[in-house]
Design a protein with these regions (language model features):
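N-terminal active-site beta-alpha-beta segment that forms phosphate/nucleotide-binding
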Residues: 12-93, 97-103
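Conserved phosphate- and dinucleotide-binding cores of soluble alpha/beta proteins
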Residues: 97-215
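N-terminal glycine-rich FAD/FM-binding segment characteristic of electron-transfer flavoproteins
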Residues: 8
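Short, Lys/Arg-enriched N-terminal segments with co-localized hydrophobic residues
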Residues: 1-4
Length: 215
């Protein structure tokens, strides 16, 4: 078992470092972390104290421990979970467009550094595309696939059904486990964003992590 893990770590490191170079060629900053702890350390090196931070719904950011570190540090964290009304939640989501740092992940990423994100409300993909000064993404190596076509398939047939189940949403994919290209009223695949380049150099900062994170 230890040998199997060691071989997998070697494979992920070689692949991860190649993906880092691919992301850098797309005008983004990228880093490969072998552990969640290393990922959090790197993220906090990037984010200056006193920064205003917002986020989309991203399990990966919670799972690696970054949110706990930010909440216990000297940052202005806009926490949607503390909103007491739907209106307040919307207000916090809209504040993302003027924040210093927006945190999130991806639904899938190809080995050549293109990533796919699918949203229902679209607050996350909107902020990735425009607004926040910096976008920091935590991406487990479980989300890296060979091609852009594979990335789209992973986003729609793996990530979306799991997220629909996670939120208790009544869609065909939540019942059957894969995408039916539905037009259900509760569809969470309303907006699909393909990110292939950053016009603003270094606006995207991506930490690849040798862990299974998110969905």
């Amino acid at each position: 078992e230890a040998i199997k893990m060691d071989v997998r770590q070697k494979r992920n490191k070689v692949l991860g470092e190649r993906v880092v170079k691919a992301l850098e060629s797309r005008n983004m900053d990228a880093y490969y972390a072998e552990t969640k702890e290393e990922a959090v350390k790197k993220a906090l090196e990037w984010i200056p104290e006193g920064s205003t931070i917002n986020m989309g719904g991203a399990s990966s950011v919670h799972e690696c421990g970054l949110i706990d570190a930010i909440k216990s540090g000297n940052y202005n964290f806009c926490d949607r979970d503390k909103a007491s009304t739907p209106e307040e939640k919307q207000e916090i989501a809209r504040a993302a467009f003027s924040c210093d740092w927006f945190l999130g992940s991806v639904n899938a990423m190809s080995e050549d550094g293109v990533f796919i994100n699918i949203d229902g409300n679209a607050n996350r993909v909107a902020a990735y595309a425009f607004g926040p000064k910096n976008v920091l993404l935590i991406v487990g190596m479980n989300k890296v696939v060979k091609t852009q076509e594979d990335a789209m398939s992973r986003a729609r047939n793996e990530a979306a059904p799991v997220n629909a189940q996670r939120f208790g949403i009544d869609t065909p994919c939540s019942k059957a486990g894969s995408c039916f290209d539905c037009k259900s009223p509760e569809c969470i695949c309303c907006q699909i964003l393909v990110t292939r380049f950053s016009r603003q150099k270094g606006r995207f900062k991506i930490i690849l992590v040798d862990e299974n994170l998110g969905f």
